[in-house]
């Protein structure tokens, strides 16, 4: 499908190229706008803002672009509320400084320098006190210099305190010096921690919000930012896909004009500025009317100093003019950056405005940045949820449209509800089929639709479709006649001459001005840089354009296009009748089978889940109990089913908790992260319990009525045991912290200032850092982020949230956390934080408990070496046995060939075929042993040959007949005749091997005597892929009773280097073979029976242009 205008292509690479092209075009517009502003200022002429925005050029000269970027990044000016030094590393020699250094550092009160350039070349440390020099030297020597900001320093001359904010540039280090209010370092630290605590409180508010409402999330964050900073106005700006912006949330002083709903052109926040926001995520302007201070630098430097990350960087005159026009003197802007799996995206900005000069200290700005990082994480999750909900809605609509097509193709999608208009957001839609039109909503006339179809066939005949937000830009000559009602269009070709259309009106129709009602109609000076001018300019820019088509919408259209093509195959020109009822019944049967398969798959997922899952009906009787909860409690599913959860299984301490959870869930209110206690059964002491953190979810039937409650849990018993022991010590925690016992987990403690106060022996072993190295250092930044490197900013943000929540006394959830130890090894852990209190109950910090995901024990390596030796000896024995087995097997095969000539009946022929299949199975096993086999993960040959399922089943059953008779078990089978004789392509012997292994395990663990074993083979849907036709076949092997031991199933699923039994080895390798054949194996436990489910897809035709055999790598 082709795309024009502002639309997005299907290809990710094409999308990337298109986005890059948009960014370059926007850079051109920004550069030209800036150049015109500079020219107007130099000439004294007025700057016509609206005209410059509307007539932005597509290209500018290289000189204009260079000047633009240099002006933004290397402007040579700073704001006057602080001063700046640039130094060489590591000599501290000054290579640049701001002119106001003399005033702020008190240098004029000392020896007056003979000339203003006298600071160049001197050692910057000599300007500060001895303690300040040591702090600066320590920071400069750090690998991650920014994590230590701010540094507390004092001027040597006037003893004034400063926040020193350091960052590296191409020629050295820039030191921004911001005056501090207090001269006491302790108050500085306390103020910083208090700011972080306020931020954590705000973050807790964000995290407690119900999901699915981005608007509420934005409204909450602007309220919290205003409480933290005290600005008159706080807004959330969102950047749209075409780079234009919108105010989506606002809180303001009551007498200020509202800006909520304002849209502004992309040039209002230039691309270069957006790039800077990704680098320096908090930007403060204290006073837009203040005269900027010049930066002087060493003459040897080839270009002006880079001020990209400077907290003092002066704003461009264009921006200060804009601020002054809107009555905003001071501002604080914070970037909302989303770190997706693909890239780092600037989603928008949180912007604070004040009507008088305002300075926010660095620690408070850092707390705001911390809040923004948490907001970005929460926002990203909400965006993902919104995307999933949108996709779900599209899939539901597609399902309904498909159902209509089955009954009334192709007209049901335009004559019934829902229609194609409900698939994507649009103002109108049309079906053009067999020269006729069906129109819905706001569309061109029937004649115009036909004209568009002819234009598409003539100009885009080789395309399957087209999408654009501007038909004029796409080249359609009749676009002016359509007016504003139809600006954007998406099409999908469903046959060689037939189309589906979706239409959108121009963007201005969708945009609502959020300010005073008269503003859009004001006749004032549109050339002034002002939000109203921005809005008017935006409306002019998007004139004749619709909202762009999103990727998900294009994908939905493309999916419907494919469905329509399939449904229209075979429909003649005069086909107008509904699809007959037998076909409808077939489709109902298919849907019923699909729903049944989905239900079975869900049961298997729950059963094999690695977390405890259990459920009750509305009366509190247990009706679900998976393998994990059975393992934790010692209560098997067949015993647990039918018991009362509260009376029979729950510890008395959790009776009321479960009653409340069930009561709320049965009313449709679900709870998360609730701690409960369950009893242990079996050989455990009577007082032992299992600690779980559970989520309570409502269970509903097909009518959506609530019929019970499902609990999904997480086992926290090990952590609880350590925590309980710690609590019992009542403050005397030395026994744990100082213990060398390897069973004690890694523990460290934080004081109320987020500095490390404890670091036990297990932490030393885990990180390689000894206690004396870390005590007193800040945990976020200095230790985790500096000494122990992290993978990214998000990891530090999540750790800071957890740490400050613990310090603030809030409950914390287990956090997945990772860092690099001293040797550079990456360590994966779970971490929890719990508050520390003194004897009066006052919070004095928190304890952090780490649980490693994988612990390496030195003694295991020695044991592995011994095991390797034993394996080598065993392999030699195998080699001897393999060779000795081949000789008698060849004799049996020769005798078998002789018997073939004496066969007189069909039964005898079948016996010989079964015998031959078993012989081939033995030979295949020996050959696999020769080549290393799947035990070592080497290559195993999967052959492709024609065979019938009936022969495989005969061979498999023959291998278990003797055990069946010995145990007096009855063999039941349900195999349709058409499946028995169905010719398919695959590796018959490998299939025979795995089925016989699974069936033999079923027989071994079936209760006897008078038990039974059942084998059932069920066909599924046919699939067409890469020109090959596949059929899905499911093998079910069932027996009554409690089933195979859990340890055996664990061996089968997980494998590893140590198995519980030899049977576990066999099952693991068999399931490995099934996976190599692109199949799946599940073991399902029900109340009265258990069974293996083996799902495989087989080709029903000889493979096209493929080798008859291929090598497949074992997982």
Curated annotation (Swiss-Prot):
Gene3D superfamilies: 3.30.450.270, 3.30.450.40, Histidine kinase-like ATPase, C-terminal domain, PAS domain. Residues 213-383 form the GAF domain. The keyword Nuclease does not apply. GO terms for biological process: detection of visible light; red, far-red light phototransduction; regulation of DNA-templated transcription. GO terms for molecular function: phosphorelay sensor kinase activity; photoreceptor activity; protein homodimerization activity. Pfam families: GAF, HATPase_c, HisKA, PAS, PAS_2, PHY. Contains one covalently linked phytochromobilin chromophore. Keywords: Chromophore, Photoreceptor protein, Receptor, Repeat, Sensory transduction, Transcription, Transcription regulation. Residues 880-1100 form the Histidine kinase domain. Residues 672-728 form the PAC domain. InterPro entries: GAF, GAF-like_dom_sf, HATPase_C_sf, His_kinase_dom, HisK_dim/P_dom, PAS, PAS-assoc_C, PAS-like_dom_sf. Residues 598-669, 732-803 form the PAS domain. The keyword Transit peptide does not apply. Phytochromobilin binds at residue 318. PANTHER family: OS08G0260000 PROTEIN, PHYTOCHROME 1. Homodimer. Belongs to the phytochrome family. Regulatory photoreceptor which exists in two forms that are reversibly interconvertible by light: the Pr form that absorbs maximally in the red region of the spectrum and the Pfr form that absorbs maximally in the far-red region. Photoconversion of Pr to Pfr induces an array of morphogenic responses, whereas reconversion of Pfr to Pr cancels the induction of those responses. Pfr controls the expression of a number of nuclear genes including those encoding the small subunit of ribulose-bisphosphate carboxylase, chlorophyll A/B binding protein, protochlorophyllide reductase, rRNA, etc. This is Phytochrome E. It comes from Ipomoea nil (Japanese morning glory).
């Amino acid at each position: 499908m082709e795309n024009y205008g502002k639309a997005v292509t299907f290809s990710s690479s094409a999308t990337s190229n298109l986005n890059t092209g948009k960014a370059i075009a926007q850079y051109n517009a920004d550069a030209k706008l800036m150049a015109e502003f500079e020219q107007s200022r130099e000439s004294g002429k007025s700057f016509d803002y609206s005209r410059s925005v509307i007539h932005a050029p597509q290209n500018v000269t290289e000189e204009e672009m260079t000047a633009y970027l240099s002006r933004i990044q290397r402007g040579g000016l700073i704001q006057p509320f602080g001063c700046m030094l640039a130094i060489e590393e590591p000599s501290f020699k000054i290579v640049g400084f701001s002119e106001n250094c003399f005033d702020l550092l008190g240098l004029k009160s000392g020896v007056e320098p003979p000339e203003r350039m006298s600071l160049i070349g001197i050692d910057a440390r000599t300007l500060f006190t001895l303690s300040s020099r040591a702090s600066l030297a320590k920071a400069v020597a750090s690998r991650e210099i920014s994590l230590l900001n701010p540094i507390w320093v004092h001027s040597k001359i006037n003893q004034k305190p400063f926040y020193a904010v350091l960052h590296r540039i191409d020629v050295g280090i820039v030191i921004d010096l911001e005056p501090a209010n207090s001269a006491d370092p302790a108050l500085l630290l306390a103020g910083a921690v208090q700011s972080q605590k306020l931020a954590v409180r705000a973050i807790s508010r964000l995290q407690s919000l119900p999901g699915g409402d981005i608007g509420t999330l934005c409204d909450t964050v602007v309220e919290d930012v205003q409480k933290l900073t005290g600005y008159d106005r706080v807004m959330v700006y969102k950047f749209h896909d075409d780079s234009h912006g919108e105010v989506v949330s606002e809180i303001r002083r009551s007498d200020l004009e509202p800006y909520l709903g304002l849209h502004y052109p992309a040039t209002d926040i230039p691309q270069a500025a957006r790039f800077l926001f990704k680098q320096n995520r908090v930007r403060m302007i204290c006073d837009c009317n203040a005269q900027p201070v010049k930066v002087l630098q060493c003459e040897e430097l080839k270009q002006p100093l880079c001020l990209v990350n400077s907290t003092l960087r002066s704003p461009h005159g264009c921006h200060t003019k804009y601020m002054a026009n809107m009555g905003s003197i001071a501002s604080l802007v914070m970037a909302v950056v989303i770190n997706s799996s693909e890239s780092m995206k600037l989603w928008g900005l949180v912007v604070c405005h004040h009507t008088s000069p305002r300075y926010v200290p660095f620690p408070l700005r850092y707390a705001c940045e911390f809040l923004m990082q948490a907001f970005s994480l929460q926002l990203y999750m909400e965006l993902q949820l919104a995307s999933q909900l949108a996709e779900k809605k599209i899939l539901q609509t597609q399902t309904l449209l498909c159902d209509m097509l089955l009954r009334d193709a192709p007209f049901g999608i335009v004559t019934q509800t829902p229609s194609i208009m409900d698939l994507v957001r649009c103002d109108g839609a049309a079906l053009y089929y067999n020269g006729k039109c069906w129109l819905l909503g706001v569309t061109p006339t029937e004649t115009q639709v036909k004209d568009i179809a002819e234009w598409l066939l003539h100009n885009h005949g080789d395309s399957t479709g087209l999408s654009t937000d501007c038909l004029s830009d796409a080249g359609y000559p009749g676009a002016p006649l359509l007016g504003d009602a139809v600006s954007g269009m998406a099409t999908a070709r469903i046959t060689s001459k037939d189309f589906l259309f979706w239409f959108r009106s121009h963007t201005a129709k969708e945009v609502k001005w959020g300010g005073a009602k008269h503003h859009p109609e004001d006749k004032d000076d549109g050339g002034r840089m002002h939000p109203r001018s921005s809005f008017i300019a935006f409306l002019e820019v998007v004139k004749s354009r619709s909202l762009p088509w999103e990727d998900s919408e294009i994908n939905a259209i493309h999916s419907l296009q494919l469905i329509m093509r399939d449904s229209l195959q075979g429909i003649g020109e005069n086909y107008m009748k509904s699809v007959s009822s037998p076909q409808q019944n077939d489709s109902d049967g298919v849907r019923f089978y699909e729903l049944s398969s989905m239900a079975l798959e869900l049961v298997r997922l729950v059963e094999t889940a690695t977390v405890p899952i259990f459920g009750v009906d509305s009366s509190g009787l247990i009706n679900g109990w998976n393998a994990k909860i059975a393992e934790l409690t010692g209560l098997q599913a067949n015993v647990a089913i039918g018991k009362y959860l509260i009376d029979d299984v729950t510890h008395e301490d959790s009776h009321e908790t479960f009653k409340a959870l069930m009561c709320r869930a049965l009313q449709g209110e679900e709870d998360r992260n609730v701690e409960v206690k369950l009893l242990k059964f079996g050989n455990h002491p009577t007082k032992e319990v299992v600690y779980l953190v559970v989520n309570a979810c409502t269970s509903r039937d097909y009518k959506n009525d609530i019929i019970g409650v499902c609990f999904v849990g997480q086992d926290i018993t090990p952590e609880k045991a350590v925590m309980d022991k710690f609590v019992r010590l009542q403050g005397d925690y030395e026994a744990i912290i100082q213990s060398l016992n390897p069973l004690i987990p890694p523990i460290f403690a934080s004081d109320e200032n987020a500095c490390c106060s404890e670091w036990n022996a297990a932490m030393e072993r885990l990180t390689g850092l000894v206690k004396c190295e870390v005590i007193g250092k800040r945990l976020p930044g200095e230790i985790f982020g500096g000494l122990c490197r992290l993978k990214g900013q998000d990891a530090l943000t999540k750790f800071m949230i957890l740490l400050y929540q613990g310090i603030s006394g809030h409950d914390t959830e287990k956090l997945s956390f990772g860092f690099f130890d001293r040797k550079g090894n990456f360590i994966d852990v779970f971490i929890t934080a719990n508050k520390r209190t003194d004897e009066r109950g006052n919070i004095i910090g928190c304890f952090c408990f780490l649980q490693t995901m994988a612990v390496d024990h030195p003694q295991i390596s020695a044991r592995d070496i011994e095991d390797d030796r034993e394996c080598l000896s065993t392999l030699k024995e195998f080699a001897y046995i393999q060779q000795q087995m081949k000789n008698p097997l060849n004799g049996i095969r020769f005798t078998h060939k002789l018997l073939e000539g004496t066969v007189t009946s069909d039964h005898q022929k079948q016996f010989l075929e079964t015998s031959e299949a078993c012989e081939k199975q033995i030979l295949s096993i020996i050959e696999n042993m020769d080549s290393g086999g799947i035990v070592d993960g080497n290559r195993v040959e999967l052959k492709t040959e024609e065979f019938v399922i009936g022969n495989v089943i005969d061979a498999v059953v023959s291998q278990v007949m003797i055990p069946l008779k010995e145990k007096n078990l009855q063999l039941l089978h349900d195999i349709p005749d058409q499946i028995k004789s169905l010719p398919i392509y695959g590796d018959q012997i490998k299939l025979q091997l795995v089925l016989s292994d699974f069936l033999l395990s079923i027989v071994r663990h079936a209760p006897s005597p008078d038990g039974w074993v059942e084998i059932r083979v069920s066909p599924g849907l046919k699939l067409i892929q890469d020109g090959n036709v596949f059929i899905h076949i499911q093998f079910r092997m069932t027996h009554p009773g409690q089933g195979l031991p859990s340890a055996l199933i664990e061996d089968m699923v997980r494998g590893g280097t140590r198995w519980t039994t030899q049977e576990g080895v066999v099952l693991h390798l068999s399931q490995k073979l099934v996976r190599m054949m692109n199949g799946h194996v599940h073991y399902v436990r029900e109340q009265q029976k258990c069974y293996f489910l083996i799902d495989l897809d087989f080709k029903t035709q000889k493979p096209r242009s493929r080798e008859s055999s291929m090598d497949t790598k074992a997982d």
